[in-house]
């Protein structure tokens, strides 16, 4: 089942103002954190979600961009839309402490994965929290975090280091 073009285009045209229009589709460019930052700067965004087989291909002429959230198929674009809404919302002022955003995976400063996180107890089934994190030496902790971020990125997402 393919969704008709006419009701979707009418809905897009009825939106007050000029929202940035995105069609969610497996054929779109892959969504990344850099796109979240770009969308954060937009005044408004309209997300078009297909379902089952998607939407009439003519819709592509009425949107600004086509985005895919990954190389997999969902039954509909609603979950993909929620992913985009969440990733953009958390970048809005006041949503999350701006200092916290700087050290996250895919931060604008460095494109590394975030360093490993630990909590209590210090030892769990013979696995211990790294001693440097218990040292209280913030300079050493910062160096450890940076090194671990690079290690994790190299291990899990080497494509980010290119």
Features from the language model and the residues they span:
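Structured helix-beta-strand junction loops
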Residues: 18, 42-43, 62, 147, ...
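Alpha-helical scaffold segments in soluble metabolic enzymes
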Residues: 10, 14, 83, 87, ...
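Internal, active-site/partner-interface "lid" segment
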Residues: 79, 91-131
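S-adenosyl-L-methionine/SAH cofactor-binding core of RNA-modifying enzymes
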Residues: 1-51, 56, 93
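SAM-dependent methyltransferases
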Residues: 121-162
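Short, flexible loop/turn segments with low-complexity composition
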Residues: 21, 96-102, 158-160
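Structured adenosyl-cofactor binding patch, chiefly the S-adenosyl-L-methionine
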Residues: 55-101
